[in-house]
Amino acid sequence: VPQYRFDTPNNLKELDESMTSKDETPTNEATQVDEQDLKQGPLHGLRILDLSSVVSGPMAAVVLADQGADVIKVEPPGWGDGIRGLGASRNGLSAIYAMINRNKRSIAINLKHPEGQELVRQLVQDADVLLQNYRPGKLQKLGLDYATLKAINPQLVYASINGMGEVGPYAEHKTYDYVIQALSGVLDVQAGGANAAEGQPLQMVRTILYDKITALTAAQGITAALLARARGAGGQHVQLSMLDTAVYFNWPDLMWNYSFKGQGAQLAGDLADVCEVSETSDGAIVSSYLGVDTRQYETEQLVDLLIENEIPVGRVNRREDLLSDPQIQATGILQAVDHPRGG
């Protein structure tokens, strides 16, 4: 999905001082790292300017931050990123904002003001990556587009995320995840697709699926661009849209009946048609199609029976069940930490 174009803190004073101490070793040359650097993550020593907001951009940036990059989140003065006020919160800190902006530093800059624009251009001089998810053309009007910033820092990897793409009849449309769900065909899939009963209502996916998939795709595209730069490709522009990412993600299975052009293809149902949700006396499980009434079994009893017969199965967890699931606890994927504001 990413199309590559190859070309040959809270206190500004503290931020400036920290930037002057940055290792001046060129980042486009292979360098030997010590054991301490490795412990700090594979992207330690790289600086990311995160000009993005809401989910797709910030979540891409937090992946880079978790891998050791120094991410500086740039927000408008006052309210900041609008997602600060979305969803569950404590002490004025929303959970989703905390989750996708951890491990970052923050600075407030008014990008509409000439002095704010100049400040970003100064920050770009020592940056490795700039990430933004404004609508196409918006940053060009502010003098912060790729062509302008490339002249300041030819080694810059500039990543642009947008909703619909740079061109086309929808390019200027304001876009959120639910819009991409509508266009991508996934509502038809959720309703049962070709096998749906007449009049079956269309169904949304009850998570911001394509925001998050776009974020992960962007993070991968950025690291690929950094690898290309280390091999001598120089700075480049990584571009992807949520719609392109959704089509790419959906295509292997949800669109397999549309992959062969012309006649002669043998069509098939969806992968979801081979599995089912089976109710139990105290919950439910998901497995391959059983075709029998399982309500006389307790969940764990039925799970054990199917596992014994080498049938893939999972009990249906409620969201609150996930926290105590023994497999989740065993892997340690969830960690409890103290937050100075959220607790």
Where are these regions (language model features)?
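Short, hinge-like loop/turn segments at secondary-structure boundaries
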Residues: A88-G92, K174-V179, W256-N257, A330-L334
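Acyl-CoA thioester-binding alpha/beta core of soluble enzymes
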Residues: V1-G78, N133, K150-A159, A246-G343
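Active-site-adjacent "lid/gating" segments in soluble enzymes
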Residues: V63, Q67, Q140-E276, S281-Y289
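Structural signal for hydrophobic
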Residues: L86, K104, Y158, D177-V179, ...
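Short glycine-/small-residue-rich Rossmann-like dinucleotide-binding loops
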Residues: S53, L111, R135-P136, N162-G163, ...
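Glycine-rich phosphate-binding loop and adjoining beta1-alpha1-beta2 segment
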Residues: D66-N103
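A structured beta-alpha segment of the ubiquitous adenosine-cofactor-binding alpha/beta core
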Residues: D37, L49, A95-A151
